[in-house]
Amino acid sequence: MTKKVTINDIASLVGVSKATISYYLNGNMRKMSLETREKIRLAIEETGYQPNKMAQSLVTRDTKTIGVVIADITNPFISSVIKGIHDTCKKYGYTVNFTNSDNDQLIEQENIERLQQQNVSGIILDTVDANSLLIQKLSKKRTVLVDRQSREVTLDTVVSNNRNSTKAFLAEMKKAGYEDIYFVTFPIEGISTREMRYQ
């Protein structure tokens, strides 16, 4: 059975203290030379060392986990958003905990509360209702809205440029000779992205 590589092994291999390795793993490298950083990186890569995420989170108070609350996971558009979130989080060393609200505000609230209890590093929220009281109570520092904008609160928000996209689409339709153009949508009221498309 292969012996598990520890932080002490990496420290011995590189010739630095355990504390230096810990600083590196926690991203605190301001006082560390580029040479030392590279030695540590190579040692970790060569040995396949896996840091203990639980122990790290106790030291840094950062679980390196992003909670994602999706209004409706069956929405075809959201699948590309989910993939983008997953790939970006993975790139920066974060794991992702996805939840589905089934377009139900009570389920959404339960999902958010559960993620907060798990002390996630942050929450990405594709909300059922961007103007609800629930959204107004969320911490601005640890929550990002996606695909819905709130009129009631100011939160970091990531949305498509729906208004310009619709204008560009209509221009192409007219250019192609279409005259009778109909707008078919789910209910518009309260959904910022649909409102922008309609305007």
Model-inferred region functions:
Residues L125-A168, I188-E189:
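Flexible loop/hinge segments that line or gate small-molecule binding clefts
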Residues D156-F183, M196:
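Hydrophobic alpha-helical segments within soluble ligand-binding/sensing domains
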Residues D87-S132:
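Central regulatory/effector-binding core of bacterial HTH transcription factors
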Residues M1-T63:
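N-terminal helix-turn-helix DNA-binding module of bacterial transcription factors
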Residues T2-T6, E45-F77, V81-K83, Y92, ...:
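N-terminal helix-turn-helix/winged-helix DNA-binding helices
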Residues F183-Q199:
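Secondary-structure junction motif
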Residues L34-R37, S79-K83, K167, R194-Q199:
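Short, surface-exposed alpha-helical segments at coil->helix boundaries
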Residues K18-S22, L58-D72, D180-P187:
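Short beta-strand segments enriched in small/hydrophobic residues
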